[in-house]
Design a protein with these regions (language model features):
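Transmembrane helices and adjacent periplasmic/lumenal helix-loop junctions
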Residues: 168-186, 307-317
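Primarily membrane-embedded glycan-assembly and transfer machineries that use lipid-linked glycans
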Residues: 2-163, 188-312, 392
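A cytosolic-side transmembrane-helix exit/cap motif
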Residues: 145-146, 165, 215-222, 312-320, ...
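Small-residue packing motifs within transmembrane alpha-helices
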Residues: 14, 160-167, 194, 317, ...
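Hydrophobic core segments of transmembrane alpha-helices in multi-pass, intramembrane catalytic enzymes
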Residues: 141-150, 176-179, 314-323, 372-379
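Alpha-helical transmembrane segments in multipass membrane proteins, preferentially the mid-helix core
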Residues: 278-281, 316-329
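Aromatic-enriched
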Residues: 35, 326-399
Length: 399
């Protein structure tokens, strides 16, 4: 069956837009709108986000339970209150809808900024699309996080280290994950500027919330945030023991299959970190696009599959990594490489949808954190390819 028509353009008024781009934004709008019209109970995550701003300005502990406002607890840093502020002051449902669309647009923008050729760009969007909808159904912040990580790489490539450092610092002070962007220091032509800008933005965004709260409260809030993250890690492991929706990670798979629920994450994360570091010995490839993009892909995947906080909507970050990994593969694709991508699309992305049998989803995929498995397989392949990078080098024009 020929699917080349997917890469065609359609005309909207005076403008031409690709079918995939059109579907990306239409589905995003429909997805967010469908949650908004179901009522406040369906946008609980957004209520948590809104609460960060409201509690920051009223100087209430950001990390306590507020059952009269929302369910669950907040685990985002105080800087997040500034990002959500413009939406929080809007009428609830309008703010929520625009928040969801911002996430869809920002990830789209980041993917476009990778400057792949048109077909490859659309392939990345297509691979990410189902997972984006999963995240938007939960009005999550994860597409924004994926975009920050991608842009931290893009801006290093564009020699705009001040912007790369800004993405890393702001992301770190809201949800930690974008700290992986510091690896792109290796690819910078202005390493001193990269470090200095990083220090500047870290201090800037750390203190910026004082414009809406007091210095004393902000200082205490950082201690509260740290404690909430420690508590969250412990709760994730408890959730894993119950076969819940948290700890959808490599460690979660190990804990759930082995039923050794006190299995320590460091037995996985430290070896994983070492495997990520080992290919850095190939210094002569630091300027090579394939090498850089492979690193971008495994860092996006690592952020999720080695986090005990990972849940299904978090996987838009990892799947963005899978999409980048696919683009750098040498053609013609081997059966093994094609099978790995199909495995990820089916078990990671489609398993969260109603297209997947509920019995299998509930009794196997969720119970054993199997959503992480295809991304882990691709992560292993990506690390292996980085170690043998000389066999992967492509002409940059192929992207």
């Amino acid at each position: 069956m020929n699917f080349n028509w997917l890469f065609n353009d359609i005309k909207i008024g005076k403008y031409k837009v690709s079918i995939i781009t059109f579907v990306w934004f239409v589905l995003s709008a429909v997805t967010v709108f469908s949650e908004v019209i179901r009522g406040a109970h369906s946008i609980n995550n957004y209520l948590v986000y809104k609460g960060v701003y409201e509690h920051l300005i009223s100087q209430q502990n950001l990390y306590l339970a507020y059952p009269n406002e929302y369910f669950d607890l907040n685990h985002y840093g105080p800087a997040f209150g500034l990002l959500i502020a413009p939406f929080a002051i809007m009428p609830l449902f309008i703010g929520c809808f625009l928040w969801g669309m911002l996430n869809a647009w920002f990830l789209y923008y980041a993917i476009i900024k990778l400057r792949f050729n048109k077909k490859n760009t659309l392939i990345v969007l297509l691979i990410c699309m189902v997972e984006l909808m999963t995240s938007l159904h939960n009005v999550q912040y994860n597409p924004f996080i994926a975009a920050l990580i991608i842009l931290s790489y893009v801006f290093v490539k564009e020699e705009k280290d001040w912007l790369a450092a800004m993405c890393i610092a702001f992301g770190f002070l809201t949800k930690l994950y974008p700290i992986v962007g510091i690896f792109f220091f290796l690819f910078s032509n202005h390493k001193v500027k990269f470090v200095l800008w990083g220090m500047f933005w870290l201090i800037f965004f750390a203190v910026l919330p004082v414009i809406i709260t007091s210095h004393e409260f902000l200082h205490q809030t950082y201690f509260d945030w740290w404690q909430s993250l420690v508590d969250k890690t412990n709760q994730n492991i408890v959730c894993s023991a119950a076969g819940g929706m948290q700890d959808i990670s490599v460690m979660g798979m190990i804990r759930r299959f082995s039923k050794v629920y006190d299995f320590r994450s460091i037995w996985v994360t430290i070896p994983a970190m070492l495997l990520i570091i080992v290919p850095m010995k190939n210094i002569r490839f630091y300027k090579d696009s394939t090498y850089q993009l492979l690193y971008l892909s495994i860092l996006l995947i690592s952020t999720v599959i080695f986090s005990s906080s990972a849940e299904s909507p978090t996987y838009i970050i990892a799947v963005a990594g899978v999409a980048v990994w696919w683009i750098v593969q040498v053609k013609p694709y081997t059966t093994f490489i094609m099978s790995a991508l199909i495995f990820a699309i089916v078990l990671t992305s489609l398993s969260a949808t109603d297209l997947f049998p509920h019995y299998i989803k509930d009794h196997f995929i969720t119970t054993y954190s199997l959503k992480a498995l295809p991304c882990f397989v691709i992560w292993i392949i990506g690390v292996y390819q980085l170690m043998g990078i000389k066999n992967m080098v492509k002409n940059p024009t192929e992207y």
